[in-house]
Amino acid sequence: MQENPKDLACLSELPADSPSHGGIQASPDLESTPHDISPDQDNYQLPPKQEERVESVSVKEDAKDLEDGGPEYPSSWKLAVIMLGLCFAVFCMALDNTIIATAIPTITDEFNSLDDIGWYGSAYLFTTCSLTLVFGKLYTFYSIKWVYLIAILVFEVGSVVCGATPNSVGLILGRAIAGLGGAGIFSGSMLIIAQTMPLERRPICTGLLGGLYGVAGVAGPLMGGAFTEYVTWRWCFYINIPFGAVTALFILCFFKAPKPIRKTSSIREQLAQLDLLGLLFFIPAIVSILLALQWGGTQYAWGNGRIIGLFVTFGVLILIFIGIQWKKQETATVNPRLVKDRNVSGAAFYCLCLTGSFIVFTYYLPLWFQSIKDVSATKSGIMNLPTILGVVICTILSSGFVSGLGYYTPFMYIAPVVASVGAGLLSTLQVHSGHAEWIGYQALYGIGLGFGMSQPMVVVQAVLAPADVPTGTAIITFMQSIGGAIFVSVAQNVFNNLLLQRLAQDAPTADAAMIAATGATSLQSVVPQNLLPSVLEAYNSAITQAFYVGVALAAVSILGALPLQWISVKGKKIEAGA
């Protein structure tokens, strides 16, 4: 599959200083006579201090593309094989976020490790969130193919450690290692898509991977429960090994490695470009905020010195990190120039809010089903399917519309409106709400999410210069991870506080501490029958109040769409650093 060389001329449709050019101005010669470009002629007029970031976009390479009829993409069957491998990798990486949830009771029984429960999930989350931006730099300076394969290898090693561990410490270590590899899988998959097809076809494939990410969120607890009940909990991690191996084989054999986007010579120069000083402050800052959110209101009161200390540590470290980024500019982990780009910052905020809303409902809808409708964890996952089907179907449909129409911005307006209406209706659920309500409300919410969840990735590929696409992709991926982590903790604290308040009002004679500590699936079996109606009302109120966090996020996400430019993905020669 090749692009038409005349498609280069469409770059001139945008103002020379437009962010969509990534700072690259097209000369009159390039605009008028693209076929007359000499390999030795410099036709790019670059703003000051931006020559380094477009090293790979040389005139010689552009001229060669023109002579050859455009960049070469893999054949249809090779592309299908590559996409299958990417789907396996993204599904397993996303699956690891939730698959352990239903296996934790069995694991704690085997290892006698009740105090370590929080670390089983957070160890994976800490390394994933902390190192996502690091992979953005690695993909910029080294071969996308080999960095991606290393990420897969590290993820596989972590999975093996988790599955084979003889104790709780080994499981926590394995989760951290798997998270380290997982940090590079999603953004790397998006960059491989950018290397294997023209821009106008990418929305469909990015939408497919985004839909799989959502499916994995719900499939995780179902698969974890099935493995734990019928085989062993260790297969929650062993399942990653064959899929990861197939992905590595497909990428190794069928993905043609592009040249690094920026070339560096000496080891010293490479270390300087990786911004190790910035990472020295960024990683502990992220760990501090995640620990504060995980412990606050659960293990420790919000006013506890540990929680306050973690928030203060986060604030100090992140301010130092921002200062380092401002000083380093082009060699920073997060280039300030990208943050100031209204398209990138808007897409990042949009992704933060919409993904945060999705994760809140992914966690708390099953809780509503288990506690109020008295179903098992497996059945609650099945009852959550209307949301997931809505997300997957509309993600693929909207991605196809973007490829056909060329514009992603309209769908980024539609998504918050529809999703916030669906989320608002879900927050009205009552103890006696029937199938029509919880199915219909979920479907509407999922449809809204599907229109918008994959679009931020399209934005950064459409508006950024090739050398900036890996960093832009990493920013969006980081926002996905951190958004879920932050807002689930916010919803958890809303739920905990409201539950205790409502129990005191509606069921003052009930043992509030015992009810709060009881799992959702055991609620109706441990509460006395004479108190059960009042307790269910209190539980329902607390959960739907937690839903308000997801409602607010869905509504506020539209603010991220407002600054976006209306840029078409059709007919543009924009590559991710080929």
UniProtKB/Swiss-Prot annotation:
Disulfide bond sites: none
Glycosylation (residues): N343
Keywords per UniProt: Glycoprotein, Membrane, Transmembrane, Transmembrane helix, Transport
Sequence segments annotated as region (Disordered): 1-70
Gene3D superfamilies on file: MFS general substrate transporter like domains
Primary residence: membrane
Subcellular localization, as worded in the UniProt entry: Membrane
Annotated membrane topology: Multi-pass membrane protein
Ranges of biased composition (kind: Basic and acidic residues): 49-67
GO terms for MF: transmembrane transporter activity
Pfam families for this protein: MFS_1 (PF07690)
Function: MFS-type transporter; part of the gene cluster that mediates the biosynthesis of chrodrimanin B, a meroterpenoid that acts as a potent blocker of insect GABA-gated chloride channels.
Similarity section: Belongs to the major facilitator superfamily. TCR/Tet family.
Protein name: MFS-type transporter cdmB
Biological classification of the source: Eukaryota, Fungi, Dikarya, Ascomycota, Pezizomycotina
Gene (UniProt): cdmB
